[in-house]
């Protein structure tokens, strides 16, 4: 009987133990399920929140956000991420149960009874630590997807791409040679401020995407630059970015910029600076009227802003693109805050040639009466000789000079027209020959301006053997008036978007900005084909530039595809006509596309009116009126005897100016455009 009672006692004990163990295991599984469910809910909501524009850097597991319903592709991506987390959680639960059963079995083998032994559950913190890798990976993937969907032209949240500076080595001319290093970019973590230029950015590497198709290459390249959509002029001369896919510049060739200096810290320009910087403005500046000028030979600070604007047209490689992104530029400062002198420019030409620059850009000039006499019995022939001597010196050194035509709507071949114009500013006793210098010389490439349709800019001078590139127009400004010109967005397609000495960007117009496009294009030709003779280089340019309305127009794709004509100086006219016909077709297609885009944008702007209040219209009108009148008054000084002036206008807007909020109107307009475009896409 005792044996039977003992056996029954053991059986009852085992049954009670199994019951307790089962309840403990079920409790553990329930806790694990709750934790994983909570984890999934938090992460799914955090990811969904990021699709609404959240800037949270990490997933917050402490508070839940309501789910967002969407019919977009983003919802599918989020659902996929949630499924991944569910699957991962299920695996984790099975692992936890298996581990717990092993622990319980071990304890059970050591003792006859576990009725007083409780299983220790895995803590929530431990579970979160084990799932950290899964959560982080999912978050990174989701952020990448969302980042790719963001609108590039958002001035508030854009991150500029900055070209990574590879290891440098100097060639015989002292130019930095980075050609052996692959092209790469760095993406700034900090955002460009409207009030403060970018400095000392922390960056992370971003690889360059490569495609087998030229069209895809161009698209990938240009899409990585936030403000490409606002550069109608660059689209025109590059065939919508095709030239970037055809050839990317090395660091073997440099362009010398004779201008007002440069903002060295500008993120779009800082990685393009060469080894040569020279200030040729003497102490006291122009006519000793600039007390801030110290004569420091290494001072290249751009007080005027013009040099920085010009440099962006050549080498910008960040939020915007120049015609030759990243190509080396050397700086020769001849302007303080206003005007320059011919002897300073002549010295700069010689210095730039000595420094090995194959192309020398001069977006400035003056009118010289080289015969006849003024009231004092003299003329400008000596200044003419100063230019001629310097240009001959540069040509002999293998450098070609590119200079801007004036912005006075003059036919420089009509001397009477030139005389009549000059009489408005100078007292002429005996009229003589008037020239537009330094663009007048045979060895110089003279550059005029066109608008987005290939027509000569309403302000541009014209001349024989000149080449034309986008410089903008003021036709709509004069036609519609100041208020409508801004409110309907004409300036977006009439003026040019370029780098400014604020560290940001600015809208400008003038032949000053057609000239650097030609300079940058010539630098690409020299870099690709190795043409060293300046006269041959000029002929190559003219032979490979299509005629539009009887004028030679810059087309960089044609230049980069013109190798067979590089040394064919006796090409027959039939071949020229065939090539020009093809080039004209390309340009016509580009112009037609641009016109359609402009018409659509103007119509859209009319309907939406930019959502800008009337007070913005009034402010912009005042800004334009004041600046336009100032520029007209400055024309008197620019055309005074002995003065060299820049050949551009900067009216609206000066973005990023920390001293005046009013000119930031352009940023407001473009930001609103970006929002409207994103809404349209959604």
From Swiss-Prot:
Q: What pathway annotation does it carry?
A: Antibiotic biosynthesis; nisin biosynthesis
InterPro entries, sorted: Lanit_process, LPXTG_anchor, Peptidase_S8/S53_dom, Peptidase_S8/S53_dom_sf, Peptidase_S8_Asp-AS, Peptidase_S8_His-AS, Peptidase_S8_subtilisin-like, Peptidase_S8_subtilisin-rel
- Residue positions of the active site: 259, 306, 512
- Any idea which UniProt keywords this protein has? Cell wall, Hydrolase, Peptidoglycan-anchor, Protease, Secreted, Serine protease, Signal, Zymogen
Q: Return one GO MF term.
A: serine-type endopeptidase activity
Q: Which domain of life is it from?
A: Bacteria
Alphabetized Gene3D superfamilies for the sequence:
Peptidase S8/S53 domain
Coiled-coil blocks: none
Q: Which GO terms describe its cellular component?
A: extracellular region
User: EC number(s) on record?
Assistant: 3.4.21.-
- Database matches in CDD domains: Peptidases_S8_Lantibiotic_specific_protease
Q: Which residues form the propeptide?
A: 23-195, 656-682
Q: How does it sit in the membrane?
A: Peptidoglycan-anchor
UniProt main location, coarse: secreted
Q: Where is this motif: LPXTG sorting signal?
A: 652-656
Please report a single Pfam family linked to this protein: Peptidase_S8
Question: May I ask which residue range the UniProt record assigns to the signal sequence?
Answer: 1-22
List locations, semicolon-separated. Answer: Secreted, Cell wall
Q: Which SUPFAM superfamilies match?
A: Subtilisin-like (SSF52743)
Q: Name one GO biological process term.
A: proteolysis
Question: Positions modified as Pentaglycyl murein peptidoglycan amidated threonine?
Answer: 655
Annotated Peptidase S8 domain ranges read 231-566
The Swiss-Prot or TrEMBL record describes its family as follows: Belongs to the peptidase S8 family.
Purpose? Cleaves the lantibiotic nisin precursor peptide.
What is the protein's given name? Nisin leader peptide-processing serine protease NisP
Q: Which organism is it from?
A: Lactococcus lactis subsp. lactis
**Name of encoding gene:** nisP
């Amino acid at each position: 009987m005792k044996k039977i009672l003992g056996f029954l006692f053991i059986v009852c004990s085992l049954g009670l133990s199994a019951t307790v163990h089962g309840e403990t295991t079920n409790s553990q599984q329930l806790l694990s399920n709750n934790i994983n469910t909570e984890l999934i809910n938090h992460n799914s909501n955090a990811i969904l929140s990021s699709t609404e524009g959240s800037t949270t850097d990490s997933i917050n597991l402490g508070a839940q956000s309501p789910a967002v319903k969407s019919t977009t592709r983003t919802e599918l991506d989020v659902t996929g991420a949630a499924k991944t987390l569910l699957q991962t959680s299920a695996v984790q639960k099975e692992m936890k149960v298996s581990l717990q059963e092993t622990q319980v079995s071990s304890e059970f083998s050591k003792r006859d009874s576990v009725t007083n032994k409780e299983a220790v559950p895995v803590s929530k913190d431990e579970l979160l630590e084990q799932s950290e890798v899964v959560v982080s990976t999912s978050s990174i993937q989701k952020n990448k997807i969302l980042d790719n969907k963001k609108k590039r032209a958002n001035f508030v949240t854009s991150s500029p791409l900055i070209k990574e500076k590879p290891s440098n080595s100097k060639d015989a001319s002292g130019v930095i040679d980075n050609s052996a290093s692959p092209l790469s970019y760095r993406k700034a973590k900090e955002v460009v401020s409207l009030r403060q230029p970018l400095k000392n950015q922390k960056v992370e590497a971003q690889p360059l995407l490569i495609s087998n198709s030229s069209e895809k290459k161009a698209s990938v390249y240009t899409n990585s630059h936030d403000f490409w959509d606002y550069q109608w002029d660059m689209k025109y001369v590059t065939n919508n970015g095709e030239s970037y896919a055809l050839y990317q510049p090395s660091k073997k060739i440099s362009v010398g910029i004779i201008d007002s200096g440069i903002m060295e810290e500008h993120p779009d320009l800082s990685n393009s600076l060469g080894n040569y910087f020279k200030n040729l403005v003497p102490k006291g500046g122009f006519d000793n009227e600039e007390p801030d000028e110290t004569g420091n030979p290494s001072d290249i600070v751009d007080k005027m802003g013009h040099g920085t604007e010009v440099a962006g047209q050549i080498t910008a490689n960040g939020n915007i693109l120049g015609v030759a992104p990243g190509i080396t530029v050397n700086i020769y400062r001849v302007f303080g805050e206003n005007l320059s002198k011919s002897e300073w420019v002549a010295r700069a030409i010689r210095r730039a040639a000595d420094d090995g620059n194959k192309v020398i850009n001069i977006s400035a000039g003056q009118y010289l009466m080289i015969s006849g006499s003024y009231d004092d019995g003299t003329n400008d022939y000596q200044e003419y000789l100063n230019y001629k001597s310097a240009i001959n010196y540069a040509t002999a050194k293998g450098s070609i000079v590119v200079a801007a035509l004036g912005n006075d709507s003059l036919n420089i071949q009509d001397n009477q027209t030139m005389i009549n114009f000059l009489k408005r500013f100078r007292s002429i006793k005996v009229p003589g020959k008037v020239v537009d210098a330094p663009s007048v010389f045979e060895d110089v490439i003279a550059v005029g301006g066109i608008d987005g349709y290939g027509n000569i800019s309403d302000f541009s001078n014209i001349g024989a053997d000149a080449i034309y590139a986008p410089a903008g127009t003021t036709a709509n400004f004069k036609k519609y008036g100041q208020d409508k010109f801004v409110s309907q967005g004409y300036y977006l397609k009439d003026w040019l978007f370029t780098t400014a000495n604020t560290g940001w960007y600015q809208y400008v117009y003038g032949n000053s900005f057609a000239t650097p496009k030609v300079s940058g294009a010539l630098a690409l030709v020299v870099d690709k084909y190795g043409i060293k003779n300046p006269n041959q280089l000029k002929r190559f340019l003219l032979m490979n530039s299509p005629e539009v309305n009887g004028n030679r127009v810059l087309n960089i794709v044609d230049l980069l595809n013109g190798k067979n004509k590089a040394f064919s100086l006796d090409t027959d006219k039939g071949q020229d006509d065939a090539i020009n016909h093809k080039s004209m077709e390309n340009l016509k297609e580009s112009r037609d596309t641009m016109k359609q885009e402009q018409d659509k944008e103007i119509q859209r702007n009319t309907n939406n009116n930019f959502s800008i209040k009337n007070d913005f219209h009034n402010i912009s009108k005042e800004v334009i009126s004041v600046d336009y009148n100032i520029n007209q008054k400055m024309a008197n000084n620019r055309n005074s005897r002995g003065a060299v002036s820049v050949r551009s206008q900067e009216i609206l807007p000066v973005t990023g100016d920390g001293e005046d909020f009013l000119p930031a109107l352009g940023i407001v307009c473009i930001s609103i455009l970006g929002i409207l475009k994103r809404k349209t896409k959604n």
